[in-house]
Amino acid sequence: MSAGRPGPNVGGELSLATFNTHLGVDGWGRPYDVVAACRSLDADVLVLQESWAPDGSPSLARRVADDLGYDLVEEPLGQGRLLGPDPGADDRWGPSLGPLSTILHVDDDPRWRQRRSGARRSGGRHGSWGLAVLVRVPARFLGVTRLRPLRRDPVRRLVLSWEVPVGNGVLTVHGTHVSHLLQGSPVHYRELSRALAPGGRPAVLAGDMNLWGPAVSLQLPGWRRVVRGRTWPATRPHSQLDHVLVSGFVTGSGAVLGPLGSDHRPVRAELVVDDAPPGGAAGGTTAPGTTAPGGGGHGTAR
């Protein structure tokens, strides 16, 4: 870890936040300050979804890590062209609560290419977007668990896992961004249930699950919801799509926070790792489909 960052969590507590950044823009394509938004979360661990990286430039997650002093692992999930701000924008967050296709054209997806011909504006910048997990406390990156491609989802899906010493134990931290239900997410939930089977060890799973809380609980037995509250759409939320789940000897509390510029509200939790019996700490064993550090060179850790 770099000098000046917080040391080990000797008190047995860890703060974590998950935030879907919506590529760092509102529904009209107008940028907001993602670094300031993440600074306000003040979390030891940040799970960021839809982190935009223009070709040849640092990603939003990298900028957050560099400015706020985090270590970072990130993986691209898709590529496309992010359009510039809509000249017809008004004071609303966006023109609708529709898909990202209003501001983003996804590569290798015929449905989105068809929409391109009728787009209200052109131009923009090509790049990629993905998932990132950032830590500002001592930690060890465990690997990447890749989920199988779904025919109706043009975006890759995966899990990034870290091991964080907390108090006298070790907490395994998983960050993810799951497909939408209409794209076949139950397939991925079955994979997650097998690959991340709790087994009694302290762990947390956080991210945009694209699914309501009760359904998430049914899909992931053994995981408990820490925060309950509506997260989407950020302006007038009616559903909770963003979750923090724990298993093993972990308790916690938290809240859904106010809007920070995205269409999702962030979720922040304070987690406590209780003393576990001998042998109950999480180990470094990787799950099936997992790339260990250095095994594929896809994640970047400083």
Label every PLM stretch briefly:
Residues 1-45, 53-56, 67, 71-302:
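Active-site regions of metal-assisted phosphoester/phosphodiester hydrolases
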Residues 50:
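Second-shell loop/turn segments in exported
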Residues 62:
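Active-site phosphate/pyrophosphate- and oxyanion-stabilizing loops and adjacent acidic/basic residues
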